[in-house]
Amino acid sequence: MEKNCGSGQNKLKALRMHIYFEVDFQEQAQHYQAVLYSRGVTVDLQPIEKLNARFLRLNPDLALCVDENGLWLSANGMKMQPDWKAEIPRLKRASLKSEMIARACQLGEKPVLVDATAGLGHDSLLMAYLGAQIQLVERHPILFTLLEDSKAQAQRDPFLSQFMDRIQLLFADSASYLQQLDQEAKTVDVVYLDPMFPQRDQNQQAIKKQAQVKKQMQLLHLLLPEDGEMDLGDHLLELAKKVVKRVIVKRPRHAIFLANQEPAHQWQGDACRFDAYFQ
């Protein structure tokens, strides 16, 4: 089990969730129930005859489900998990020269990097593959458990297992964790921020998402509502700048600057950009 820094859930409301499962997966469902309960989530186990697309369509409320591929988040006829194994083709194409994120975060120097806005962990997975030591921070107990499950599956994969020891999952509030790093003067080279809700461009127009990303984000938005509580955006930038000399912020290409702060440098791609803040 990954590290619990003690502050992961103290600002979250009480959570209750169903876990749907076929009878063959009852033991796994009970395991997830116990893990989530230890993180403040009350889980109701719901055995069903068949967990399929029809069942998901008929049960549109936000829930969890368990099958041979582990733990999933489901709603509105869709299901989603971080699924790190699906990222293998992308990783095999990646290199320090080809990836813009590698240049922005100086991954060739094998930095110690805090990803303070974990999401599905795909960027951290890429950065760990390219050599970084990653501290992946997430405070929502359900999303953290989904990430933990994806890492456990990755550790059993011949390709991914080669660098899983470079990813440390931390069940913590990112703001509190950055403050802790500042107080303890721990060595971190880079803080990486990819806020979940940068939905506006420089003209305050809504930014469109690709279909697959939109599908994943729809479910994450249901789990992490955009009410200011879960949007770990603007306030993290100032905290991060106190901790490290290099803060990298990922943004949609035409999005406004995080916290309205102009970066010192930018790397521009077709769909996104990386804004750098140096101290």
From Swiss-Prot:
EC number: 2.1.1.242
Gene Ontology molecular-function annotations: rRNA (guanine-N2-)-methyltransferase activity
One CC-aspect GO term: cytoplasm
Subcellular location: Cytoplasm
Chain positions recorded as S-adenosyl-L-methionine binding sites: 138-139, 194
UniProt enzyme class: transferase
Keyword Transferase tagged: yes
Reaction equation(s) it catalyzes: guanosine(1516) in 16S rRNA + S-adenosyl-L-methionine = N(2)-methylguanosine(1516) in 16S rRNA + S-adenosyl-L-homocysteine + H(+)
Keywords assigned by UniProt, alphabetized: Cytoplasm, Methyltransferase, rRNA processing, S-adenosyl-L-methionine, Transferase
Its job: Specifically methylates the guanosine in position 1516 of 16S rRNA.
Similarity comment: family membership: Belongs to the methyltransferase superfamily. RsmJ family.
Protein name: Ribosomal RNA small subunit methyltransferase J
Organism: Acinetobacter baumannii (strain ACICU)
Gene behind the chain: rsmJ
